[in-house]
Amino acid sequence: MSTLRLLISDSYDPWFNLAVEECIFRQMPATQRVLFLWRNADTVVIGRAQNPWKECNTRRMEEDNVRLARRSSGGGAVFHDLGNTCFTFMAGKPEYDKTISTSIVLNALNALGVSAEASGRNDLVVKTAEGDRKVSGSAYRETKDRGFHHGTLLLNADLSRLANYLNPDKKKLAAKGITSVRSRVTNLTELLPGIPHEQVCEAITEAFFAHYGERVEAEIISPDKTPDLPNFAETFARQSSWEWNFGQAPAFSHLLDERFSWGGVELHFDVEKGHITRAQVFTDSLNPAPLEALAGRLQGCLYRADMLQQECEALLVDFPDQEKELRELSTWIAGAVR
C-alpha cells in the first residue's frame, strides 16, 4: 500500500478547504505523506494569532463580499483569489521536514522553466530586473507527532487588490497580536504567460511523486457532497464561524471618536475573544444619560456591528426623546467597527 496520498479540491470555499486540511491532518497515519492542492475565491486568510480588525479592512471586505478565514498555522495575513495556487504538504515525525516540501515546490517551478530560490523563513523568490520578487509564501504547523507546510504560489493574482483589504483603516487599535509584513511580489504569469492553475498543480504533483519514488491516484474533494472525512461537518462549522474567524483575535483595545451636531462622543472598548470586556463612553452632549446607559449595555456584547447596533436601538425604549441621536450613533458605530 502506498504511503502517499494526493488530494485535489474542486471547491473555492476557504472554510471548506481549510476544514478539509484540518481533518486530513488530524486523522492521517504518521507514516503517510500527503499533498493537498486547492485554491480559494476572494478571501483574506489570517494567521492563528492575528487580529482581523488590525490586519484587514473589514468594512471593505464586507462591501466586496471578500471572506475572512483564520488558519490554524501562524504567520501573517494574505489575500487569496483564483489566481493563487495553494498547496499543503503533511508528514509524520521524525520524517516531517519543511525543507523537503520547499525543494519539491522549487523542483516543480524549475520543471516549468522558472528558477526560484528560498528566501528567509518562508518565501520563494525569483530574480527580476527590479530585484528579488516574492512568488510564494508559506506557513507551518507542528504537533508532537506530525507537521504540515502550506503555502501559495502567485500565479495570476490580482495584485492591485492586496492593498484594498490588507491596509486597514487608521483605527486606534492598541493590539497585542502580530502585524503583517508586506512583501514585494510578482505573478508567475509574468515569467510564464498564460500558464493555468492545472499545469502548476501537475508540476507540483510530478515533483512530489519523483521525490518519493511512488505514484498514487488523486482523490478529488468536491463541495457537492460532504467529504468522507472524520468530523468534517463539525470542523467546517467551526472554521466558518464568527467565533473562530473573529472571536479568536488576541485581546485589544479600540478607541472610536466622532463629533455630531449634538455633541462629541468617545468610545473606549477593551475586547477579548471577540467580546467587549469593558466599555467607557465620554461625551460633551447636554444629555449624556443614553450614552451612559449604552456603556453598561455593551459590557459583554459581541464585538460585531449588528450586535452593537442592536444594543443602541434597544435604548430607544428608555430614551424615546433622543431617537435622532441614538439612530445617528447606531449607524456610526455599526460602520466604525466593521
Swiss-Prot record:
Q: Does the keyword Nucleotide-binding apply?
A: yes
Q: Which residues bind (R)-lipoate?
A: K134
For this chain, one GO molecular function annotation is: lipoyltransferase activity
**What keywords were assigned to this record?**
ATP-binding, Cytoplasm, Ligase, Nucleotide-binding
Biological processes, Gene Ontology terms: protein modification process
Pathway assignment reads:
Protein modification; protein lipoylation via exogenous pathway; protein N(6)-(lipoyl)lysine from lipoate: step 1/2; Protein modification; protein lipoylation via exogenous pathway; protein N(6)-(lipoyl)lysine from lipoate: step 2/2
Q: What is this protein called?
A: Lipoate-protein ligase A
| Source organism (scientific name) | Escherichia coli O157:H7
